[in-house]
Amino acid sequence: MSIFSSRRQFLKSLGLAAGAAAAGNALPGKAVEIPAGDHLWKSASPAAPRPSGSTYMGGFKAPRLGRIRLAFIGVGGRGFSHLAQMCVMDGVEIVGICDLKEELTKRGVDRVLSRMGKSPLGYSGGDMEYLTMLKELKPDAVIISTDWSSHARIACDSMKHGAHAFVEVPLAVSLEELWSLVDTSEATRKHCMMMENVNYGRDELMFLNMVRQGVIGDLLHGEAAYIHCLVTQLGDTRGEGAWRPEYHTRINGNLYPTHGLGPVAQYMNLERGEDRFCRVAAFASPALGRNAYAKKHLPADHRWNNTPFICGDMNTAVVKTQLGRTILVQLDETSPRPYSRANLIQGTEGTLAGFPTRVAGEKLGNGNYHEWIEGREKLAAIYEKYDHPLWKRIGELATKMGGHGGMDFVMLSRIVECLRNGEPMDQNVYEGASWSSLLPLTARSIAQGGMPVEFPDFTRGDWKTTMPLAVVS
């Protein structure tokens, strides 16, 4: 079939599309459908038993794929970056690209043709056009880089059409959506992996390796954050600025928990045999910074000068695990301060921390844990001894390829390796659901005055049988 059709051109005007990329392409001024209030957490009750015929997906090994027929849904900034990196992967054939905007679909098609010598089919139009692509091409796997509100719907549809789903962060917004992803993955026996790229950063991989080797003893406490001033998005009409600020007007909670939480959760083996998330209590500061920015930098009649923001500028939550460990999780996308994900893990014999990278412990350096080992020269010996085998193997190439310092390339390489070798994914659907659930759970806790709220057990008790993530080479 032709890349574009008159029907697709007509559909282009009908609504917010599957192609609104994580850094990409929602329609300017088009409202995003955002669940709010108790709609975020209405499926927080204990899970029903797993339906007959469904499969627990922790450690699941799908049949090997000698060649991966891959499709993309959403190729704005984030999706196009994934597309460009997948063009150099062995064993990958990019068969389809879908985006709301015809020009972005064409850009993706042209990139694949120039790099791989074969043109994928392009789809563009309304927000359900991706279904046409799934039905016609039947891809093995799909990479989804759309606005948050469409993640769950598109991923579930992809799995129902026989494709493994790889989804940008967060996996979904509401507990109901997260349960639908878990249930669909189990029913279809298809991987549903949230692509938490930060877990593949050099420091995060090294800390995982050090924790697995027992360098800091028994784990006690972690700290995770997403501190990133994004207020300038209020002046944007394309990309994330077209839809992401809307969440700050609808939800008072941690809107973006997984970048900081994902690595800490895997250090602690949460939902993987050793420990699990139990409850969280959250609090929010006043929401002042965005209205102040809009008043200072935008016209008086601009929508953001006539819309109240409710998401506190700083969101602080404390997570308690079944073993009694604690995790501090913070979000601030508004205040003028340097970027940080915290990335701290503390044990009985030492502490590893990020931003800046620094370590201290009884088994590190000369054992003087009253001072940090930090700075390029002092950390050189730590990297030499503890760099993760995966980073040693492909870190140099990943750094050259770019993508958040190489973490994107390492993540995509592992996805390809796992699919081609029939290995379990490094991040299973239950981890993606648990990490993403901080969004609705912190909103619920804040709405209830900071009362602790329980985490759903997305594994239905089977986390106890799931192996910890190995230090793969």
Swiss-Prot record:
Catalytic activity, EC: 3.2.1.-
InterPro entries per record: Gfo/Idh/MocA-like_OxRdtase_N (IPR000683), Gfo/Idh/MocA_oxidrdct_glycsds (IPR050463), Glyco_hydro_109_C (IPR049303), NAD(P)-bd_dom_sf (IPR036291), TAT_signal (IPR006311), TAT_signal_bac_arc (IPR019546)
Entry keyword set: Glycosidase, Hydrolase, NAD, Signal
Domain of life: Bacteria
Pfam family, one: GFO_IDH_MocA
Signal sequence, start to end: 1-31
Enzyme class: hydrolase
PTM section of the record: Predicted to be exported by the Tat system. The position of the signal peptide cleavage has not been experimentally proven.
Required cofactor(s): NAD(+)
Residues bound to NAD(+): 77-78, 99, 148-151, 168-169, 197, 256
Role of this protein: Glycosidase.
Family: Belongs to the Gfo/Idh/MocA family. Glycosyl hydrolase 109 subfamily.
Protein name: Glycosyl hydrolase family 109 protein 2
